[in-house]
Swiss-Prot record:
Residues 92-199 form the PET domain. This is Testin. Residues 234-299, 300-359, 360-422 form the LIM zinc-binding domain. One of its GO terms (cellular component) is focal adhesion.
């Protein structure tokens, strides 16, 4: 029975989102079909985040799992039906009257996520301070951006061994220890407050811990004219620009009360993207998203996108791979000891390269083998052979000679060109 249940779980995982359209390829993709171990669509090779696969419920369960057994349990609730922790995502609905010809209608704007603060005006101002195309208004480009970042920054397979492919018992144990460690030591959620409120909070924290008063990040010169004009003496830890009076700031408890960020500056040190839902990982004085924090701690397989907990793995093309996952991107044959070609940063075996990616020779019209020398000019290609790279008129070999290219044809002289034109 247990084996049967495990099998069902795997099957359902691959059925989830099946047939969902690709937002990138549009009608070129037949619909989402999850590759057995890669985190991509088998039809178009795009990632899950490029398809309309994950629902808000699935995202909420993933984030809920992340916050389980942390100091952020107030942000989750466990469903009575299955006991799975679910993220209590704060949704903000703003209404405003719109004057019409006869009567007044109500305009409603729903944010799929907003900072969990009691002061809605503060949350609204926070949204105004991040780029418009990243504001998670329901049905907008910003809402889609948030979904993509949830998938990219917080992959489920970075926290849940059951989402990984064929881990050994020892690898599962190592992963569980790794996840427990980052939950206890580096995981955090940003908080939106006015700097003066943070200062008051810092004062209380400073006195309660060691009797000394923590100081907020302030401008170095007390008579700074710019600061005086803007009415604030607080500056952003990232950009060093001044905070405007009355604007909210983001702070990270792991970083300490002496550091504040503009809402648009609360970004990952590596990818420079807004930290989705202000979820951060603090390491060596820098903010990271979940993905790039994990990348700084463990090698990541370029094939399955999972962290590598095995002592044995391979390195190729500057990337790390599980031994069983260094495979052809097209046919999945293992490439160890085989000839392969890199196509758009993906390793492809020689047969697949010749079949799917090789350019054709303008002379013989056959595919050009990747190990064979070629001549390329302006998007046209020839075998570097005396029977292929020849004058289109007199068949003179042009290897090492001057030539005149005309729409895929090459000529040895003006005379030959004129003969072909007449």
């Amino acid at each position: 029975m247990e084996l049967e249940n495990k099998f069902k779980k795997v099957t359902l995982g691959h059925e989830e989102g099946s047939g969902a359209p690709c937002l990138k390829c549009k009608e070129k993709c037949e619909g989402f079909e999850l590759h057995f171990w890669r985190k991509i669509c088998r039809n178009c090779k795009c990632g899950q985040e490029e398809h309309s696969v994950l629902s808000n419920n699935e995202d909420d369960r993933k984030v809920g799992k992340l916050f389980e057994d942390t100091k952020y349990t107030a942000l989750i609730a466990k469903l009575k039906t299955d006991g799975i922790p679910t993220y209590k995502r704060n949704v903000m609905i703003l209404t405003s009257p719109v004057a019409a010809k006869k009567d007044v209608s109500i305009n409603t704007v729903t944010y799929e996520w907003a900072p969990p603060v009691q002061n809605q005006a503060l949350a609204r101002r926070y949204m105004e301070l991040i780029p418009k195309d990243k504001q998670p208004v329901a049905g907008s480009e910003g809402a889609q951006y948030r979904k993509k970042q949830l998938a990219k920054q917080l992959p489920a397979h970075d926290q849940d061994p059951s989402k990984c492919h064929e881990l050994s018992p020892n690898e599962v144990k190592q992963m569980e220890q790794f996840v427990k460690k980052y939950k206890n030591e580096v995981l955090g959620v940003g908080d939106v407050k006015l700097p003066k409120e943070v200062e008051a909070q810092a004062s209380g924290a400073g006195r309660s811990t060691n009797g000394s008063l923590s100081t907020l990040t302030t401008v170095k010169s007390t008579d700074d004219k710019v600061a005086a004009q803007k009415g604030s003496t607080y500056y952003c830890f990232r950009c060093k620009e001044n905070m405007r009076e009355g604007d909210p700031a983001v702070y990270a408890e792991r970083a300490g009360y002496d550091k504040l960020w503009h809402p648009s500056c609360f970004v990952c040190f590596t990818c420079n993207e807004l930290l989705v839902d202000m979820i951060y990982f603090w390491k060596n004085g820098k903010l990271y998203c979940g993905r790039h924090y994990c990348d700084s701690e463990k090698p990541r397989c370029a094939g399955c996108d999972e962290l590598i907990f095995s002592n044995e793995y391979t390195q190729a093309e500057g990337l790390n791979w599980h031994l069983k996952h260094f495979c052809c991107f097209d046919c999945d044959i293992v490439l160890a000891g085989e000839i392969y070609v890199m196509v758009n940063d993906k390793a492809v075996c020689k047969p697949c390269y010749v079949k799917n990616h090789a350019v054709s020779c303008q002379g013989c019209h056959n595919a050009i083998d990747p190990e064979v020398q070629r001549v390329s000019y302006n998007g046209f290609h020839w075998h570097a052979a005396p029977e292929c790279f020849i004058c289109s008129c007199c068949s003179k070999c042009l290897i090492g000679q001057k030539f005149m290219p005309i729409e895929g044809m090459v000529f040895c002289s003006v005379e030959c060109k004129k003969k072909m034109s007449s």
